[in-house]
Amino acid sequence: MRKRIFYIFIFGLSFLFFSCLSFFVRPPHLIESRGRCSAEDLTVFFMSQNPKADRAKVKRLAQFYIEESETEGINSDIAFSQMCLETGFLRFGGLVSEEMNNFCGLGSLGDGKKGESFPSEKTGVLAHVQHLKAYATAKPLVRPPADPRYKYVNPKGKAPTIYGLAGTWAADPNYGKKLENILTRLYKSVY
């Protein structure tokens, strides 16, 4: 009888443990997928990481990321998280400055090469999303190219997951893990 109660207890405990684990939504790894977060979700997460940022600007950028990513078939959660990684949550520094509207370091190759500048936030976001699409898939762009460096990514589709961006998009071998870390924090804050 004691053995039976023990087994029932262990079964109940394991059921509780595994059912609690299933509530956490795992972050996406495939770049060519659909984002889950709303502009408000992205904004709230971002502000928790950089409370001094301009909330209106962050919300605008979040909405642009959702719209442009949806158009090009790229995961907006991944693109937005990559912007957070590349800009230090809009703290910038290094070769890219805020007024450049360059949210992913496009063209900043070191040796003093500052990188691309874009006329508006929306154009800068579109260029980022299109550049990310070049790494994720060989499918053609939906919108006319805003990314002047799109043509240099060859072969197209060489990094379909966030982990493939390590050593391709960025030299850092831990780049994919850093991006996953931001996505995990985002999803834990939302789900």
Show the residue positions of the predicted features.
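Bacterial N-terminal signal peptides that target proteins for export
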Residues: 2-9
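Bacterial N-terminal signal peptides
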Residues: 9-19
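Catalytic cores of secreted/periplasmic lytic hydrolases that degrade extracellular macromolecules
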Residues: 2, 20-191
